[in-house]
Regions:
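Catalytic cores of DNA base-excision repair glycosylases
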Residues: 2-208
């Protein structure tokens, strides 16, 4: 089958395994809190993020409170996640910008979101697709990279280039699904160290 047919079939097969695919980030109740969760999750497991956000949102539930938070307190709360010092600075700066310019609520536009400190193409699209199914782009993390390259959907290694390769293969209406499904498949089945072979789909199409 050609690359577009393979991409379509792969998504269908993974969707059979995870029909209700959604984020594994927890403890959030508002769009602002969800954005903070995603920002903290870069290069860090969702499980680790979930350990810190309960305390973080218990003390700082919204952009207003987080915008005036003491940097040392935030750093201390999130110190168990990777790059915690940088992330602490970013979430406070983002909270200030959102409070001043958007009444504390993150915008629903992928370009506007990327103007916030610590929010890139991936973070913006995870936020928009998981919350709103907005289909403004495909978010690519390490799991999406592995799945896409393993099945030959891309030869690129740069996440942004891979995102654009996938956006050419999938109809826009399906963009929101790609990250959610590929992440779960890559995290639990097509794992980096050892694949769960009996659950791997379309084995005959694997190129890596």
């Amino acid at each position: 089958m050609n690359k577009k047919e393979l991409a379509k079939q792969l998504l269908l097969e993974i969707e059979k395994i995870y029909p209700d695919a959604s984020t594994e980030l927890k403890n959030w109740k508002t769009p602002f809190q969800f954005l903070v969760c995603i920002m903290l999750s870069a290069q860090t497991t969702d499980k680790q993020v979930n350990k810190v956000t309960k305390k973080l949102f218990g003390k700082y539930p919204d952009a207003k409170s987080l915008s005036i938070a003491d940097i040392d307190d935030i750093t201390n709360i999130v110190k168990s996640v990777n790059y915690f010092k940088t992330k602490a600075k970013h979430i406070i700066k983002t909270a200030k910008l959102l409070q001043n310019n958007y009444n504390g609520v993150p915008p629903k536009d992928v370009v506007e979101l990327q103007k916030l400190p610590g929010v890139g193409y991936k973070t913006a699209n995870v936020f928009l697709n998981d919350l709103y199914k907005s289909n403004q782009g495909i978010a690519v993390d390490t799991h999406v990279v592995r799945v896409a390259r393993t099945y030959g959907l891309t030869k690129n290694v740069n996440p942004t280039k891979i995102a654009h390769d996938l956006e050419k293969l999938y109809p826009k209406r399906d963009w929101y699904k790609v990250n959610a499904l590929f992440v779960l498949y890559g995290r639990y089945i097509l794992k980096a160290k050892k694949r769960i072979e009996e659950k791997v789909v379309l084995k005959e199409e694997i190129v890596l």
